[in-house]
C-alpha cells in the first residue's frame, strides 16, 4: 500500500512539474508577444491599493470611502438641472492642477464659464478646453488625450450633449433610435482599457430624463444608454436641497444652497454613502463650512453655545466667524483637515504623529554656541 502511494506521489510530482513548466513557457510567450506586464500573478503587483485623487471636497472624499476619485477609473456625475454637477467636476479639475497634474475639459454643452471656473480655483490658463462639433469628435478628442498618458483628468460635460454626427446632419424630427447609446457603448469599450493603463480619471457629467409610462418605481434615467452605468466605477447623484440665506444686509438673499451628493455606485469602497456640502454662488463648495461641521461632529472642534474653539482657543462666535478664522489661518485649516482624514482612515496617521512629535520637546538638547580662541583649539586637538 505504501509503495503504491509513493508511486502515485511520484507521478503527481512529475505531472505537476510538467504543468508548471508548460505554464512558465506560456507566460514567457505572452510577455514576448504582448510586452512585459501583459499577464502577472495578482500578488506580484507592487501597488495593490487603489490610488486616488482628492475630489476637492472633504465631505465627498469621506463618502467615497477611498479618500477621493480612484485613478484609472470612469466616474459619472448626474443630477437635475442646476444641482451643482459641473461645480463638483470643476473642483476635481482644480484639485488635479493643485497636485501638479494636467486637466482637460470637453465642453460639449458650450456653456463653461471661465470666470466661475477661476473662482473655484481652476487655473484657466493651463486648462485644456475643447468644444467639439459632434459627439464622435468629442469622444475622439478625449480618447487621444487619454492615450497620450500625459493628462491626469478628463471631464466630459455632458453625455446628453454628445450629439451623434448623423443626427446633426439630419433634419429635426428624423428618428435616430439608439444612435447615441451605440456611440457611447463603442466609446466605453475603446476608452476603458486606455483609462486604466494611463491612470487617467475620466469624469462624465450626465443629465436626467424620465421614462414614459412608468407607474411604479423611479422613472428617472440618464441619457446615453447603459454602457456608462456599467463601465463607471463611481456614480454620484447630485441634488440641491434648501437655499442658504445670507447674514446682515443679505439676510433675505439666497447666497448658496445645501447640496446632497449620494454615491449610488462604488467599486472601490462601500456605496450609498452621502455627503452634504454647501455650494455658495460664485464661490463653489464651502471647504471651511464642511470642515467645521465634520470636525465638530468628531469633537475635534469644540462647540459651546454659539462659540467654536480649537485646542482651547476660541476661533469664532457663530459658524460664519469660524469660517472666516479658518480662511485667514490656512495652517490651522490644514491641521484640522489632516486630523479629520486620519480619523476616517483616509490617510496614514504615522506621518501626522511624527509631525506632532516634532512639535513636542526634542530629545536632543540644543547646544549653546561656544567661542574658542586658537590656543584653546590647539589644546583640545592635543
Swiss-Prot record:
Binding, ATP: 79-86
The record's listing under HAMAP family reads: RecA
Biological role stated in the UniProt entry: Can catalyze the hydrolysis of ATP in the presence of single-stranded DNA, the ATP-dependent uptake of single-stranded DNA by duplex DNA, and the ATP-dependent hybridization of homologous single-stranded DNAs. It interacts with LexA causing its activation and leading to its autocatalytic cleavage.
Task: Give an example GO cellular component term for this record.
Answer: cytosol
Homology family: Belongs to the RecA family.
Localization terms from the record: Cytoplasm
Q: Where is the signal peptide?
A: none
| Example GO biological process | DNA recombination
**One MF term in GO for this entry?**
ATP binding
Entry protein name: Protein RecA
- The organism sits in which domain of life? Bacteria
Keyword annotations for this protein, in alphabetical order, are: ATP-binding, Cytoplasm, DNA damage, DNA recombination, DNA repair, DNA-binding, Nucleotide-binding, SOS response
Q: Which cysteines link up through disulfide bonds?
A: none
